[in-house]
Amino acid sequence: MTVSASKTAQQLKYIKDSIKTIPDYPKAGILFRDVTSLLENPKAYSASIKLLSEHYSESGVTKVVGTEARGFLFGAPVALALGVGFVPVRKPGKLPRETISESYELEYGTDTLEIHTDSIQPGDKVLVVDDLLATGGTIEATVKLIRRLGGEVVHAAFIINLPELGGEARLTQQGIHCYSLVSFDGH
């Protein structure tokens, strides 16, 4: 292992160790991965932004899209580091200009996301960023919005992946390359 690879492995371990696990939240049997504990640690937060930015520095990305709300906390600094624009995807009624919307299925019901119609241009190469990848439903809806506006989504980045919930496989089937800093077993 090179010095650089060793340092990266240490940073990834530090990031993972900074994420607290809350058992039985929000309901019994769930192990909740609390990314806010990473945000409280400036060294871990900075390392996560640095590693994501370095990973995509040569990707040709022209926009970074972050999903409400924690995707904003990671997506905006990554966009800034890459020197590209940041685009928020939000719940209905939160964006002031003209929007399009996409509904998606949840475990019990549906939810909807919106994006400004002028925020993505045809041909934009888009990186979608969120804090956590579970089933992939939120990201799938976000990708549909971007593609409807003519953007090309080939990358999605996450701090945490929960592989057992199938989100990465779901997105990979749609041609989206997923990159996560850390993975946790369980859900």
UniProtKB/Swiss-Prot annotation:
Its EC number is 2.4.2.7. InterPro entries: Ade_phspho_trans, Adenine_PRTase, PRibTrfase_dom, PRTase-like. Its main location: cytoplasm. It is an enzyme of class 2 (transferase). It catalyses: AMP + diphosphate = 5-phospho-alpha-D-ribose 1-diphosphate + adenine. It is found in: Cytoplasm. SUPFAM superfamilies: PRTase-like. Pathway: Purine metabolism; AMP biosynthesis via salvage pathway; AMP from adenine: step 1/1. One of its GO terms (biological process) is adenine salvage. Keywords: Cytoplasm, Glycosyltransferase, Purine salvage, Transferase. One of its GO terms (molecular function) is adenine binding. One of its GO terms (cellular component) is cytoplasm. Pfam families: Pribosyltran. Homodimer. HAMAP family: Aden_phosphoribosyltr. Belongs to the purine/pyrimidine phosphoribosyltransferase family. Catalyzes a salvage reaction resulting in the formation of AMP, that is energically less costly than de novo synthesis. This is Adenine phosphoribosyltransferase. The gene is apt.
